[in-house]
């Protein structure tokens, strides 16, 4: 099934990708990866940065959403990810509509540890992308954040997935942007800590209705994330 890039919530014109644009992005990613490896090699003495408090203490109630289940990652997955702390919980609202919150934190991305993009992990678990776009989510008094939005499908099941990266008080959507932030922070602050925030929900009602529910959840949970993730 071809991947579609819907236009209802565009950020800018950057999602128009021809062959040259895709090649340029790939080249930029490879260059940044090489730079990141050099930084991590020559500045290996940087300290691991702890969370403000453990994600084990993440609230069981977020607005009108209540935790119904919590899950643990397999030891093999943990060994692959080299994540320092995470929370993976299923929340349900009063209408019985559910979503999954996954927050993973790396105190350092040295020694082979690095954030794994859902763009790669979702197909590996059988979820194929159908639509991809970026959304700008307003946060009231705080600046808005840009997140990735994916519609994925496995057999006849569909999910909407929102995710973004957090590093030292900055939120970015793109993998390249996240690498740039890591390299910059490694040079300036000798820090490579970072987090991945992913929120997903099965399509209940229409895709747009499901997306809007996730947006409202992001707006509710975002201030709570600041109590855990370091600046």
Question: What is each PLM-predicted segment?
Answer:
Residues 20-24:
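Bacterial N-terminal signal peptides that target proteins for export
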